[in-house]
Amino acid sequence: MSTKRRYEMKILGIVAGRHGGNSEILVKEALVAAAAKGVECKMINLFDYHIEHCTGCESCTMQMGEVAMDPTKKYKGCILKDKDDMDKIVNEMQTCNGVIVGVPTYDLTPSSLYLKFAQRFLAYELSFRMEIGDVTEDPHTVAGLIAVGGSCHDWQTLTLEGMGATMFTQSITVVDQMMATRNGRPGNVLLRPEQLERAHKMGENVVEAVNTPVEERHWMGDPDQGLCPNCHSGLIFRGEPHWDGLQYPFECAVCGAGGDLVKGEDGQVKFILAPNGLARDRNINESRALHLKEIVSTRIDFMKRQGEIQDLKKHYKEITFPAI
């Protein structure tokens, strides 16, 4: 089904926390700021929708690979789309110019409700849907991300990064993000006016980004946030060879930027991008297309060699243990 943008500017708030909770309050404050600038705003709380877990069936990636090799074939989308609300939500989201997402932190990471939602995004990969005509107009969506937790950054180390990692399959550019700390009870954030002000500013930043020509858009959050100069993630890991041999000394775990860690004269460690450091930037559609080639290549190799493992597959299938 084709989707078309119907409004001059539209921002969708997405909440993965309880009704009346801190995540919802902060998203509402950001939307208030956007609405004050004449933007149409909508908000959903994921607790109000039925969302099935991704089953790992690979139907979407199998279809994508087949369509990539034979454009005459039709992409039917996620096999769960008639069983829950995911199709409705994503089709609406892919008409929005901006999204503001509020998620509580559980065990250092985004809540399972948000991840259940976001890990269904692959079947709706925006650049692929545009290529085959399912989506007729690129909304060039920008995002503001809000992580909320009862403690400081040391107990929310993976939340913003985990949220950021879910944006690229929708070709969404994150222009701002904030971490709301020490909010242990519903409504706690109302005692922290500086966090409400920051959420308000995020709403204004998202509107400003939407009004900025796509090629001129830039990071509008804290310039010193994170180590990665590309996506402002704080997660940098020692690089290892990619499937095609590319390797960097260090990489950003979120966007895939490559470079090296360098200590400056001020004693501060910085992540300096390599000359080709954005060659695998996951925010770039062409870079993700390379990943699709990797998936297709891996699948072709498996299909050629699957006869070698039939006895082993049977062996492991026949092994059983008592369940609980």
List the predicted regions and their residue ranges.
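Flexible, glycine/proline-enriched loop segments at strand-loop-helix junctions
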Residues: 104-107, 148-154, 189-191
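A generic secondary-structure micro-motif detector
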Residues: 20, 79, 153, 178-180
